[in-house]
Regions:
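Short structural boundary motif marking the start of a folded domain
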Residues: 1-7
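Glycine-rich beta-strand-centered segment in the early N-terminal region that forms part
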Residues: 23-38, 52-101, 114-115, 127, ...
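Hydrophobic/small residue at the entry helix of a nucleotide-binding pocket
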Residues: 152, 188-189, 216
Length: 245
């Protein structure tokens, strides 16, 4: 039996760091360690809403869940059902948004034995059935933890669209060598968005990034300068009027 130390949610603003034994792994489950888990404001929202959050079970006060959904680690043991696909010693990441057809359950929100804020977890069958346990071959664990937030950035870029003149067709994604504006873009997710705009498959000719914090703007300006294909302008929101933009 594997012992774990985890941060568990019992209700609104009721988080407890506890050490306890995980149950025996079933044949359709996977036992894994967690090495890194990055912080997400979605977890802050979850902790504040507790049982009122749509992904948190109503009985969380008596059946707590482990929070954290941006995690990366090592597979320790694999149940018989999944031994054809996963092996002990593999690194993994989880796509936490399972998109189950009948309920909103997700790791880090809904399950008692899996979440990023833990030393060891049991990954339930639903994660593998939804093809949301991914073998990870990156160089560092922390980069694995960034897979989930980066997927959100990519989704946002892909959700942009432009109308084609003279038709009702929607062209999805940002416009190649067009103009892109990122508002409030020097926080963690904003920096990921800047990085993706510069180094992703489609690059704008001009990228404008605004924020209200001069220190953050200076940090972004230093670490993400213009590239040959993309000119970047960093602007304080007070200076980013209609005429300027």
């Amino acid at each position: 039996m594997q012992t774990t130390t985890a941060l568990r949610l019992y209700g609104k603003r009721d988080l407890r760091l506890e050490t306890f034994d995980l149950p025996e792994m079933r044949d359709d489950e996977i036992l894994a360690s967690v090495v890194t888990d990055s912080l997400c404001l979605s977890s802050w929202k979850e902790a504040n809403q507790g049982e009122n959050h749509k992904k948190v079970p109503d009985d969380v006060a008596t059946n707590p869940i482990i929070i954290g959904h941006e995690f990366c680690g090592d597979i320790i043991a694999v149940g018989k059902k999944w031994q054809h696909k996963f092996q002990p010693g593999q690194r993994y990441v989880i796509q936490a948004n399972l998109q189950l057809p009948d309920r909103p359950d997700c790791p880090g929100y809904s399950f008692p034995w899996v979440g990023g804020e833990a030393t060891h977890v049991i990954i339930p069958d639903e994660v593998m059935e939804q093809d949301c346990l991914l073998a990870y071959e990156g160089e560092t664990y922390f980069e694995g933890s960034l897979v989930e937030p980066l997927s959100c950035v990519i989704g946002a870029f892909n959700a942009n669209y432009h109308l084609q003149e003279g038709s009702y067709n929607h062209k999805m994604g940002i416009r190649p060598q067009g103009h892109t504006l990122i508002l409030g873009g020097t926080g963690p997710m904003g920096l990921l968005a800047i990085d993706y705009a510069l180094h992703g498959p489609v690059n704008p000719a001009m990228l404008v990034v605004t924020d209200t914090n001069n220190d953050k703007l200076s940090y972004a300006r230093k670490h993400y300068p213009s590239e040959p294909q993309t000119l970047i302008h960093y602007l304080h929101a007070q200076d980013a009027g209609y005429d300027t933009l």
